[in-house]
Amino acid sequence: VDQRVSVAVVGAGPSGVGLVERIAASAPELFPTGHLTVHLVDPHPPGAGRVWRYDQSPLLWMNSMPEDVTMFLDESVTAEGPVRPGPTLAAWAARVRGSGGDGVPEDLREEFAASTPTKFPSRRLQSAYLDWFFRDALAALPSNVDVVVHEDTAVDVTGGHGGPQSVWLAEGAEPLVVDVVVMAVGHLDVAPTPGQLALAEYAAEHDLRYVPPAYTSDIDLSALQPGEDVLVRGFGLAFIDLMALVTEGRGGRFEQVDGTLVYHPSGKEPHLHIGSRRGVPYHAKPGYRLQGEFAGPPRFFDVAAVERLTAREERVDFWRDMWPLVAKDVAWCYYTELYSAHGERTALPFEEFERRFAAADWGSAELRALVVEAVPAEEDRFDPERLDKPLAGLTFADEAELTEHLHAYVRADIARRADPAHSADMGAFLGLLFAFAQIARVVASGRLTDDALIDDVDTWWFGFFSYFASGPPAPRLEQLLALSRAGVVSFVGPDMWVRADGGRFTAGSPAVPGERTATALVEARLPRPSVARATDPLIVALRDRGELVEESLPGGRTTGRITTRTSGALVERDGTAHPRRIALGPHTSIRAAAAFSRPHTNAPGFRRNDRVARTILRTLHAGGPITIDT
């Protein structure tokens, strides 16, 4: 019998097309006979999806270098499926350049010609890579598997546990009838919180402008008037995008004059007053590699440590149980690089340092004394607590003094992140990447307290990781300083507060006297996930019938994320998992698994896609009842 089965993948961004590539890789082994159709549903182009779509400003950059971006598995990935090797973004761009730029959009040719493995690319270059990756995955499909693209929005999925699923599309009268549905939904679009709604109503009442959290590339910034005072809450990557769009994006230009970057305004820029909890921008992305030996996989927060924590009766607390091990591992990676690449800046034999470091607890007097003894220069010591709050305890006489301090701070950061003499920071960066995977294991065990998961892991840890390891390219911080010198940007300070009163928005910082008033307020960050406030019609339809629920923790708090099993199977209101529905993405119980990755890092997103693709292929080929590991 010619067995015909089908899968719908809702969301054709990097995650969705990564799944198609894994289906292509494993189908010859697991689905040798019969016919499989994969329906790919997304109003945006397959490969890039919404976030990486080509239709966005060329001024928006990636914050990764081309040599650090791949969609392909390599020998580091512990996956059952075959590795189908392929180029990084850098290798692909070089290949395209060598072939005369075939199939490349006309307006990208110049960037292709100038691209290097370590020059930060535009998001549109990544968009072109993702488009090519999708076509490459299609070409790799065996003859009994085909992909049908639907440029449409999925608005509902219906169907019981025992039978086919109907995927309803906004533009289609008839549903797609399939055996399994995968929701690769990316970040959740959400309605404003009550606090944000109140600010929006206040703005409307007083003829002010309020921009709630959102993807910067999706926001209409034209409401921000030339010369208007605009408060910006948030100093991360969303701010950097905003900064580019309202300056260069409005006709201003940067120019190097005698070794200093100068900004020439167009006169159309608003005046940005920026603040945040830390009061400083994210650290520049490092411009170097490790110079010495890598410390290797986690040593203190290793698999055995994770098993010990999750096997206990008592629930796991982040600061008491996990952070001392995480911090010690990251510090170990840092000092291993310092010793192996820059040993002349250390004062104890490595063997002695290693022995005493391993024996001491994080935060103990012994460890502090050891570091002071072994590492004479304070700037060579790793202090994550000080890194996290660089302005803690400081006060400034006025805005001018704060500005002077921040300029010195940012210049020092740019210099440090460009100088291989400080490659120990790259050791710490890799240590953080490894810690990410270990923390995910503890989260998956369900043993964390509610507060540890929501306040410490989902909020503080993700934030600290982004701030230290996932900041903007250094040239963006050069631009920030140039804009400050040109009077387009001002700094509010740390622990920024905002009030809505007197028909204006007012802001300030406990570290700086005085207040700023403005006629616009922009929240420069992504919205927090919330199933309860989701606006995506598919999420809303499933939620309202109890077929998709917000993750709820043992202590009664909710995380805003979509509840799934570790397999990705979608959990319903009665606690059962739907055997034919899977949800993947950053806003599910599984949490972080980036859709593309640095090469040679055994990326969790690649492992997840491989596992899901193989589960689907096995299940559909077996021909019996369909159950996705519920």
Model-derived features: where do they sit?
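Flavin (primarily FAD) cofactor-binding/catalytic cores of flavoenzymes
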Residues: 1-56, 109-620, 624, 629-630
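Redox-cofactor-proximal catalytic regions of oxidoreductases
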Residues: 46-108
